[in-house]
A protein has these predicted regions:
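PRPP-associated nucleotide enzymes
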Residues: 1-92, 96-156
Length: 156
């Protein structure tokens, strides 16, 4: 588990990485994205006076309750967070082959929302995920080799 200070610094780094991306909401695959997007939302509200709603996408559809793979908080007016034409920033902790993030991207696009960008904390540089890097406004905090070493850390 990360300390509170590390979580704040990570949220700040992701918000800085997102600069220049026009987005309305932030979300990603459960479980990796949940703490990241929540911390980003809190830090942004407190330090930048910029608020945004969050969502996450489960890998499987719930069998009870909403019977949905998408979890999103309702706005005060009762509307869903993620709706058609919403600009969604997708966040994930690690990118290897892109399997889990593909589920989130598909859920966003099926609603009719736009993927504004994709942020990754650690990109493991697997060529199976090249389609994500090439198709979206893609940014990673760190690129990591198969052996676990940072690749070009000063370039990020």
């Amino acid at each position: 588990m990360l300390s509170g200070k590390v979580k704040i610094h990570l949220a700040r780094a992701l918000l800085k990485l997102a600069e220049g991306i026009d987005f309305d909401v932030v979300g990603g695959p459960a479980v990796g994205a949940v703490p990241l997007v929540e911390h980003m939302s809190i830090v942004s509200a407190l330090e930048k006076d910029h608020t945004f709603d969050t969502f996450y996408v489960r890998s499987e559809t719930k069998q009870h309750g909403t019977a949905s793979s998408l979890y999103q908080a309702k706005k005060f007016n009762g509307n869903d967070t993620l709706i058609k034409n919403t600009k969604a920033l997708i966040v994930e902790d690690t990118l290897t082959t892109g399997g889990s993030i593909q589920v989130a991207l598909k859920a966003v696009e099926e609603i009719g929302a736009e993927v504004a960008g994709v942020l990754i904390v650690a990109d493991r540089q697997d060529s199976d995920a090249d389609w994500i890097r090439n198709q979206y406004d893609y940014r990673a905090l760190f690129n990591v080799s198969n052996s676990g070493h940072l690749i070009n850390p000063s370039a990020n």
